[in-house]
């Protein structure tokens, strides 16, 4: 990976900004086409938000409607109407960083630029901008790995054509992953940049900036989405495995791993402080593994420094064994420390720690993988379509369109090229006469004399004869075709700038080595002068024995341990660079390029020999070895992990698809056409895009004009209007997690449960509320609801049929949990058709019903026309 200059960086930034604004407009138009939000009133707009999205928008609305930002900020520290009657610190319990940032800038814009800006419009624009950041990073990431601008363009086009497989930002704009994934993607992209710089420079620079940037990205992701910690945990495990198996020097690896683990620790600390002490951030696998990774790497670094001071050579076997033990020990300590810290924190009373988040997701995984009976709430979450597994038919359609079909067409192209070369290699060459060959040699000789200004006396020199022989050999490889010879010569001359860059990098390394050698020689002269003054002149054999020792001392003194960069010995000594597996192929390619260089200029032969000899020992990887570099290995392994996660949870499949858009153009360009990029990007790119054009356009048309999409027809608007008109301002509601947050958002009525079922206390409350769908007795259900101080209970009429249709019916879930009650009828079905003491149906439409709960001391035999709710 070569470092681009300023103009290349600016050009990539300009192209990426173009994709950024294109994608922002793309998702904005899709959302407007699907919802027609500009024509809706405020209640209808807010009714579009369901589950936790409505809850988070309620927090943003409270921040935006205040006189200033800090007034709403203080109100969020003590909220009593989302888990009534308990008081909740929203900043500590929920992932509200996007709402805080958006509300802050909303107040800035409203007070200084546009007083008429609408809160929801401003919020949605912020969401579209975050989606644009994702596409911008996707383009830069693809360009970085493929080292070609068309690699980023290919990833962007694939992302847009199959947008239905990514995070559907236009369907759920307020989903937490829409805010967190841009920061996760930025952290992954910057990590690959740092790894590439280390491999190219063989030293670790900009350590403070790397720690700061990665800590900031990590903290922002952790404060925006609860799944971020799982993603970062997989990243740490991948980095631990791949760095231990790498061939880089131990000191360089240790320096980078220390900074990498420290960035995760600082990111966790920053997130913990900004969330006012969120206890869930204290006991995550990410924090435990990164902590022990930092500590054990410190031990490893001290062990390495001590062995160098003692002059011991590095034992590769012991190093590998230590790396394996260090990896296993880290995982063991990280797994064992979880329960210990939970118990210590709870007993000390420092923070109230529960296992809610992790235990909830572990129960879901156990239900999927082992088909075991888990809790009611875990079974309810597993039946959520967002957490369902990806259908095999849908997965096969994606694989067939993006992998099988393009690569089959690409295989046909490769096969045709192979047969063309095979037929050309087997064609007879005797068609040329000796006269034509001699004429071609004369043309080449004339060109050589004119270009190099060679006199007849210079023709006898060995250097000139060698250069001329190279030109004749190039002519022979072109079948003595003079026109082909000129084209081959011109094309090979164009390939010299990359080699010249490598040559200049090697010159810089040699210059640094010469400076170190000069310092060493001066010290040796001073030492010899001192010894000559005292003991006399030393013998040459003694000086030779002291050379290695003096050289090692000078190297130790030249290396500054406290500086901001760590420079390895392999960068100074080319002979210590590990050999590449494709060294023979590289020597042939360099010899072929040296032929063109020798024909191009008189002085190029000497420069090319220097460049060829230096490049063989350069630390820059060869063509075939670049695909095995650390940043490629990490990106590919991260895609495999994302694929496993996405296949298990449909909601997270966008992780695999987005990373696949980055990897797809890289594999082809690196494995097959590293040297001949023009062939790959002119032929292969066209083949790939043409194979995906038709299904891609179908997907784009389906996004703008969906055939299976219809607006929600559940009559929720009418129920919300009834609640606003016929209930008290402090009436307490409970109901299905899909709509209870919307009820709180639009009516501002207190609620006792919400959609964050991973929280243990909310899971228990939701189980009590959903007991109305079970077969329990009315007295038991009333006692459970009375403990929560519920006044109005919203029920879904579709779940009150007293029939079991599939395993995800609420009645089926309750039957699995309480098999002894299967002989009784469903309570909510009886509630809708009979008079039940302490329960009264006051509202019903085609989809929802509202039940008012009374104290058992109140008589329920009143007539319906005497109830104020029934007189409407």
Swiss-Prot record:
Membrane topology: Multi-pass membrane protein
EC number: 2.4.1.-
Stretches assigned to coiled coil: 508-535
Signal peptide residues on this chain, from the entry's feature table: none
Gene Ontology CC: one annotated term: endoplasmic reticulum membrane
MF terms (GO), sorted A to Z: mannosyltransferase activity
Keywords: Coiled coil, Glycosyltransferase, Membrane, Transferase, Transmembrane, Transmembrane helix
Bilayer-crossing regions: 4-24, 126-146, 149-169, 179-199, 211-231, 257-277, 279-299, 326-346, 399-419, 627-647, 678-698
Known role: Probable C-mannosyltransferase that mediates C-mannosylation of tryptophan residues on target proteins.
Assigned protein family: Belongs to the dpy-19 family.
Name of this chain's protein: C-mannosyltransferase dpy-19 homolog
Organism: Drosophila melanogaster (Fruit fly)
